């Protein structure tokens, strides 16, 4: 949307939902973080996932976390959340996912990317950069609740109408308009599409 400053936007309320925490906790369990020394929390938001990472690692003093988000307000929330933690190194980086390789030059053991890959326009390029930034045997764990097939077919008409109504409201009450070059990032891939991208 025009006039939408992503620097000042965050998903604080959403990231505190119980189901969101549960799904991401399971993803972190699958990633088995205890063999990781350097971890990127991509799309770190308010630090909720970073906090989960810390709770799952046995020796937090042996790790470095790169907490990355495009939103300065989200980074501020994360900074506040961990302001009293002196037992772990957390490097906060404001960056879009597609610029990750420009902002973190060293290789890492694990990249965690919870529920935000669907916002990325050039998914293939981002996944290549993530792969190139991993140590040999490194891990990339991600999820998304927005993929082709995530909504029952019978709800698609409702979702389209809801989106159109939302756009009209934003236009009429706030003079906001869609940014044309952001539309591509909302095209939802299927799980098979993601698998193909990961195997390239």
Give the positions of each predicted feature.
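Class I SAM-dependent methyltransferase SAM/SAH-binding core
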Residues: 40, 46-99
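A short SAM/SAH-binding and catalytic strip from SAM-dependent methyltransferases
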Residues: 110-122, 146
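A short glycine-rich, Lys/Arg-flanked "PGG" loop and its adjoining helix->strand segment in the class I
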Residues: 124-136
């Amino acid at each position: 949307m025009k006039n939408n400053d992503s620097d000042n936007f965050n998903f604080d309320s959403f990231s505190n939902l119980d189901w969101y925490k549960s799904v991401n906790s399971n993803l972190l369990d699958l990633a088995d973080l205890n063999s990781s020394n350097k971890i990127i929390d991509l799309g770190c938001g308010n630090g909720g996932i970073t906090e989960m990472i810390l709770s799952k690692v046995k020796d937090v003093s042996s790790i470095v976390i790169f907490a990355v988000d495009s939103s300065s307000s989200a980074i501020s929330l994360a900074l506040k959340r961990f302001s009293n933690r002196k037992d772990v190194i957390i490097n906060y980086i404001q960056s879009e996912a597609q610029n990750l390789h420009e902002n973190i030059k060293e290789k890492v053991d694990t990249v965690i990317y919870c529920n935000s890959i669907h916002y990325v326009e050039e998914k293939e390029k981002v996944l290549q950069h993530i792969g190139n930034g991993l140590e040999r045997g490194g891990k990339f764990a991600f999820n998304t609740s927005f993929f082709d097939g995530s909504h029952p077919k019978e709800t698609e008409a409702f979702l389209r109408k809801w989106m159109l109504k939302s756009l009209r409201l934003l236009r009429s009450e706030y003079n906001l308009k869609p940014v044309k070059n952001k539309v591509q990032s909302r095209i939802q891939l299927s799980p098979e599409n993601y698998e193909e991208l990961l195997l390239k």
